[in-house]
């Protein structure tokens, strides 16, 4: 409150109070009209806070509604809130785009061999987002017939990146039979055998 004094110079004086009201009703203004997308293949663990300006002296507090890390494939919209500390806020949104476009690493699979039969074990590989992946197949895992067979393994990272890798299964008997007895008894006859 300001008290004004009026004096007419003849000894007549009056005072009049006047209220001075300072009321910030202007919200902060974001420094960037739009926020650039934040992109990654697997996850976003931190976000860089944008800035805003205010008509009054003081700092603008910046917060967001994100739960970090952001790992969901696709677009997550983060809302930033600028608060001038005087009851005025402004919001601005920013897209966080997670898009895994990298295939799993193609493993080099050794042939599986056996003489009478051969059984495959599902192989593994690595993925930039999925970590360790185990191959799947609709082919048989065990083979009991002589020959070469091909198992097609599929590695799917769950984000739309799928590779297939062949693996040979070779059943090849290379061992000669072993007699049940070490030596055979002589066969003798007088006329013929």
Residues of each region from the PLM?
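Proline-threonine-serine-rich low-complexity tracts
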Residues: 1-193
């Amino acid at each position: 409150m300001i008290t004004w004094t009026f004096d007419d110079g003849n000894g007549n004086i009056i005072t009049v109070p006047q209220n001075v009201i300072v009321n910030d009703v202007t919200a902060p203004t974001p420094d960037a009209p739009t926020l650039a997308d934040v992109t990654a293949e697997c996850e976003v663990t931190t976000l860089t806070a944008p800035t805003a300006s205010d008509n009054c002296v003081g700092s603008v507090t910046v917060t967001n509604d994100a739960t970090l890390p952001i790992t969901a494939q696709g677009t997550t919209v983060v809302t930033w809130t600028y608060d001038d500390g005087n009851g005025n806020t402004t919001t601005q949104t920013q897209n966080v785009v997670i898009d895994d476009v990298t295939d799993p690493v193609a493993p080099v699979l050794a042939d599986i061999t056996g003489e009478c039969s051969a059984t495959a074990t599902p192989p593994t590989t690595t993925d930039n987002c999925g970590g360790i992946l185990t191959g799947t197949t609709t082919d048989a895992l065990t083979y009991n017939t002589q020959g070469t067979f091909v198992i097609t393994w599929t590695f799917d990272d769950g984000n739309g990146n799928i590779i297939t890798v062949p693996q040979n299964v070779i059943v090849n008997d290379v061992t000669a039979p072993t007699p049940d007895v070490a030596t055979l008894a002589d066969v003798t006859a007088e006329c013929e055998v």
